[in-house]
């Protein structure tokens, strides 16, 4: 049911504004919908185009016309337990596993597959596709990724390793192997805690018992036929050094090929973490026969620094996530770590390099942001909206004289195209061809149905705004392209509200079979009444946890983007990979439009669709190889 978050009349001003908007339908013509509601313009802007700010004209670039990406040095042949080039650092992306543990970041199986394909374009060495034992849905998603992305070899022979996480028990390990074994390069990643606090309070086991479990489970994983086994001593940052030397030496003898050293609670400083890697290299028997990895949490904001410190000390695999998402404060950010190595690898890191095609960073970041509903903060390094903005007069003067004065990364390196036309004006007279050309320049390749829907929405916005900028277009495309598979589609909505009585909403939805359903409801505000009407149709209990709205551009005619976070009933649950507890899933939804009520309802319906797509007992269908968005 709709939350009391939306029943506060103070959310809206006393001014009543009547607008007309058009909802995208699946016919050839738009459907007019009128609504009357109170609107308080937001003071928050996700993309600012202030005239006093010098902003580099950047747009998302489509790297597909460019020649094939060639790393600074060739990617070494993949061998599980060693790397032939001592300066090559493997990139292990765990967005689909650890990143999805972020509250509200639940992904559908199709979204996971889309992201995995994009990660392969990015060139990550290992994709940790999930925790197969967590749920039927997670198992099927990992299996599908192994069958598809894990078997797609490019012209250079590159194919990512597909990894599944498991706890140190036979059931988890068998489940992980059953999911990843279809990949050309499958990996099992198993872990058990080693710090005193975890041994005493969580595991309730002695050090000797944990060593025996770790040794036997690594041996069991190898016995299944898996030649690539990664082992992690959970909470290594707080574990006794001598104990780490012992347990890691035992799992090496049992057949581990990669040893991952996690700073699970993000407590270490860069100097400490680098010294930990140095000590492990010097004192662990047989460590020269495996690859050392790092996994740094961001609880103290040091995950990127710790990861780089670990690499400098000799670790040759980095576990990271797109946009740094993850449990609690998140993980080391792929884009930050990779660009730091690209910028400084030769100068201060002894020549370290990766095989990442950095031109795909922005598109990958955008896809993860839209699918998870987790907005990237404007000042986020590398991919934030302000990453290439200069407002200070001194900085502006320097930038105009020479870009290198205040810019250490060229926007083109990460998939942004520097152009005087970012913010190009399209208007109501612009045609379908002009819109399609601009979408291509922004990095989007849409099919005819998607283009038709976007075009009608674009025309609607253009009728009400003098200028339609890239920010507007990106918001519209994201609202169409990055939506979950539709169980319910919003067709029409009519709102009556004001100061003279309760708000009333009439909502029309279409189900998966195309059957139309209509419901009316009253509430203490326009959004509250609309959400209640949706609940009457869907009949799926849901609690609204968060509701937020941002204006894409400035002005009263700005497009609004809405994000909601909901929680369903107990049947939408899975197993937490770290604690082993059953946790209720949360689901996010986003919507965009000039009508804030319409965008709010679209976000709510999107979250419900994502929740209802999360089915414990349904097999994952493998979609077409064609991506909805080509980067």
From Swiss-Prot:
Q: Where does the record place it?
A: Plastid, Chloroplast
Q: Where is this region: Disordered?
A: 59-81
- Activity regulation comment: Feedback inhibition by Leu.
Q: What species is given as this protein's source?
A: Arabidopsis thaliana
Principal localization? plastid
Residues where a divalent metal cation binds: 98, 295, 331
- GO cellular component terms, A-Z: chloroplast; chloroplast stroma
Q: What is this protein called?
A: 2-isopropylmalate synthase 1, chloroplastic
Q: Where is the transit peptide?
A: 1-57
The record's Gene Ontology biological-process terms are: L-leucine biosynthetic process
Segments spanning the bilayer are none
Q: What does this protein do?
A: Catalyzes the condensation of the acetyl group of acetyl-CoA with 3-methyl-2-oxobutanoate (2-oxoisovalerate) to form 3-carboxy-3-hydroxy-4-methylpentanoate (2-isopropylmalate). Involved in Leu biosynthesis, but does not participate in the chain elongation of glucosinolates.
């Amino acid at each position: 049911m709709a939350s009391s978050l939306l029943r506060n009349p103070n959310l809206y001003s006393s001014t009543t504004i009547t607008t007309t908007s058009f909802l995208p339908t699946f016919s050839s013509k738009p459907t007019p919908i009128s609504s009357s509601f109170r609107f308080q313009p937001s003071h928050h802007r996700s993309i600012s185009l202030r005239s006093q700010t010098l902003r580099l004209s950047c747009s998302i670039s489509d790297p597909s016309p460019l020649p094939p990406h060639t790393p600074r040095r060739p990617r070494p042949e993949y061998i599980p337990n060693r790397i032939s080039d001592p300066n090559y650092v493997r990139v292990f992306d765990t967005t689909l596993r650890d990143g999805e543990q972020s509250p509200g970041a639940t992904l559908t199986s199709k979204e996971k597959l889309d992201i995995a394909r994009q990660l392969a374009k990015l060139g990550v060495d290992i994709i940790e596709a999930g925790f197969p034992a967590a749920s039927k849905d997670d198992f099927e998603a990992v299996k599908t990724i192994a069958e598809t992305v894990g078997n797609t070899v490019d012209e250079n022979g590159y194919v990512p390793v597909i990894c599944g996480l498991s706890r140190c028990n036979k059931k988890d390990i068998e489940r992980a192997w059953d999911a990843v074994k279809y990949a050309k390069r499958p990996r099992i990643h198993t872990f058990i805690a080693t710090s005193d606090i975890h041994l005493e309070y969580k595991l309730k086991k002695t050090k000797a018992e944990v060593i025996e479990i770790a040794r036997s489970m690594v041996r069991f994983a190898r016995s299944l036929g898996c030649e690539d086994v990664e082992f992690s001593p959970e909470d290594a940052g707080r574990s006794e050094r001598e104990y780490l030397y012992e347990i890691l030496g035992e799992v090496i003898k049992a057949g581990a090929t990669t040893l991952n050293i996690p700073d699970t609670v993000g407590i270490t400083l860069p100097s400490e973490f680098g010294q930990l890697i140095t000590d492990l290299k010097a004192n662990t028997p047989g460590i020269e026969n495996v690859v050392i990895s790092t996994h740094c949490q961001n609880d103290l904001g040091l995950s990127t620094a710790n990861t780089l410190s670990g690499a400098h000390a000799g670790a040759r695999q980095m576990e990271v996530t797109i946009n740094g998402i993850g449990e609690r404060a998140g993980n080391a950010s792929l884009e930050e770590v990779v660009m730091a190595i690209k910028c400084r690898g030769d100068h201060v890191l002894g020549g370290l390099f990766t095989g990442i095609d950095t031109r795909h960073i922005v598109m990958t970041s955008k896809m993860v942001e839209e699918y998870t509903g987790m907005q990237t903060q404007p000042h986020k390094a590398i991919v934030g909206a302000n990453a290439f903005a200069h407002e200070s007069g001194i900085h502006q003067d320097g930038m105009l004289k020479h870009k290198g004065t205040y810019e250490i990364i060229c926007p083109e390196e990460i998939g942004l195209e520097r152009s005087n036309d970012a913010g190009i004006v399209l208007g109501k007279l612009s045609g379908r061809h002009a819109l399609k050309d601009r979408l291509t320049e922004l990095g989007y390749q849409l099919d005819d149905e998607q283009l038709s829907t976007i075009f009608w929405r674009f025309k609607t916005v253009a009728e009400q705004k003098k200028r339609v900028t890239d920010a507007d277009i990106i918001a519209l495309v994201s609202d169409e392209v990055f939506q979950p598979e539709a169980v319910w589609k919003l067709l029409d909505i009519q709102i009556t509200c004001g100061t003279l009585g309760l708000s009333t909403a009439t909502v029309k939805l279409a189900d998966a079979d195309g059957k139309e359903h209509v419901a009316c409801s009253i509430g203490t505000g326009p959004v509250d009444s609309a959400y209640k009407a949706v609940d009457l149709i869907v009949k799926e209990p849901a609690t609204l946890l968060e509701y937020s709205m941002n204006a894409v551009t400035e002005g009263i005619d700005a497009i609004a983007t809405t994000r909601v976070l909901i929680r369903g009933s107990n049947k939408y649950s899975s197993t937490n990979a770290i604690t082993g507890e059953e946790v209720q899933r949360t689901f996010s939804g986003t919507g965009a439009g000039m009508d804030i009520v319409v965008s709010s309802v679209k976000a709510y319906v999107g979250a419900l669709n994502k929740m209802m797509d999360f089915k414990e007992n349904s097999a994952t269908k493998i979609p077409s190889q064609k991506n909805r968005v080509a980067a």
